[in-house]
Amino acid sequence: MTARTDDYDAIVRVVQLYIDGFNDNDVGKFKEAFHEDAWMFYINVDGSLYKNPISKSFENWAAPPSWGVVGRFMSVTQVGDAAAVQLSFDSEKSGGWIDFHNLLRINGVWKITNKSATHCSR
């Protein structure tokens, strides 16, 4: 894990916005966390590959009731203007997931540029 730095704290804050967006039903938090052109690829519980621009998921993710998400940062790695975060993600609505978020510092601001995930048992 990367030593704690201002960048580390900023990276964790951005990914925490993603988690909080689910629990607070807040589209604005997703928009703040993700780059507008970010994509998501994931393998669902049935083994199917899904891919789409991540912004298409914001309204569904923010729909009540709260997802009851518990997120645990498994690793945070940062080199220069790039970072990767591995997140254990468990929710009442969708079960367990392992998320991999790639981030870039763009004009001084950290943004998630893509997400890959796989469904896992609890």
Please identify what each model-predicted range represents:
Residues 30-31, 42, 114:
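Hydrophobic residues in well-ordered beta-strands that form the structural core
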Residues 6-13, 39-96:
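Surface-exposed, charged secondary-structure patches
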Residues 1-28, 32-36, 48:
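Short, low-complexity N-terminal intrinsically disordered segments enriched in polar/charged residues
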Residues 96-122:
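Short beta-strand edge/turn micro-motifs at domain boundaries
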Residues 34, 89-91, 116-117:
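Short beta-strand segments enriched in hydrophobic/aromatic residues
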Residues 38-39, 121:
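Short secondary-structure capping/turn micro-motifs that flank functional sites
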